Amino acid sequence: MLDIKFLRENPEIVKENIKKKFQDEKLVLVDEAIELDEKLRQEKNKGDELRAQRNKTSKEIGALMGQKKIDEAEAAKAKVKEINEALVQIEEDTKKFEAELKERMLVIPQIIDESVPVGKDDSENVEVEKYGEPVVPEYEVPYHVEIMESFDGIDLDAARDTSGAGFYYLRGDIARLHSSILSYARDFMIDRGYTYYIPPFMIRSEVVTGVMSFAEMENMMYKIEGEDLYLIGTSEHSMIGKFINTITDEEKMPLRMTSYSPCFRKEVGAHGIEERGVYRIHQFEKQEMVIICKPEDSMNFYNELWKNTVDFFRSLEIPVRTLECCSGDLADLKVKSVDVEAWSPRQKKYFEVGSCSNLGDAQARRLGIKLRGEEGTYLAHTLNNTVVAPPRMLIAFLENLLQEDGSVKIPEPLRMYMGGKDKIVPVK
């Protein structure tokens, strides 16, 4: 959410930003917000003036009564009553204008960084750099579910019976591999100086609307019926929410956190052949990174975050690339974002395995996350990035480390979590 003062003083900048995001239908919101802001300030000024008059008149009543000027005192009382009635209406109008203004401000997008490439959608995202050599082996790489089934490691049919489409049972070596990757990711981030958290897996609506746009909320979040609680789509939601309405001394910055959680997503609109199997699912687990920092440091930490993911995947011998998200692909709260994509030997292309985002002060403004410095308090900046999100990451892992005999190589960093195994062998 933008600062209303910034919008008031820079409406053309805000409108140009909306155009860059190809959301021209929102242009009218800028003028509406400015008009509502003016009405709101007028009402507040009228209220202040009337309260001052009321205070002055109330003092006069006592003096008039002391002078036995009863008629004048009664007239003053009537005036106070009239002012009170006017103030009631002003307070109602003020609340109405505040609500209408907030409604518009919440959907006006954050100002994107000037380095963000302009494009309509994800088809216009820009490749930044490749890490590792993408290899297509001479032998066939089966579909990831077939690889898992060769280890007797997945049961989609039973999951459909218990839960419906978009769920799965993992078992045996595949389940152990899944858990081992998460354990390695946890320790990988702890070794890089991040504090490990396991947060709540449900959050209140106040936090939901603080950490994401309404469009994201509608497409992602599952609501708990009868309660003001939502299942989280990522632990970023809980971790940022942890700091709602807080003021932290700036010398404690940055706060580097890494958090584990299950994630629950509707995945509205998911479709296509690669949505089969465990590519897009309603429930998965993830290790996340979250940073809260001073505004001037956020771009440096943004680069630190995506590099962590690249280093993690490369430590497991998986080729990846970074893809700069264009203006039209950025969610409304994001200032800048880069996807990390892993190589798929079977598909002969890259696919997303993580997303790194700098949200500037958008979440901090919505949630009241402030820092305290020598010159007073100010809004923090928030950033997040995926370390790893199996089972999607398992697709990249199994395809890239599959051997010709059907076994899967276990890279050295992962072996201590897999009981010392240097490979897992299919049972079918």
Which residue stretches match the model-derived regions?
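N-terminal alpha-helical targeting/anchoring segments
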Residues: 1-134, 149, 153
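TRNA-recognition modules of translation machinery and tRNA-sensing kinases, especially anticodon-binding
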Residues: 27, 130-428
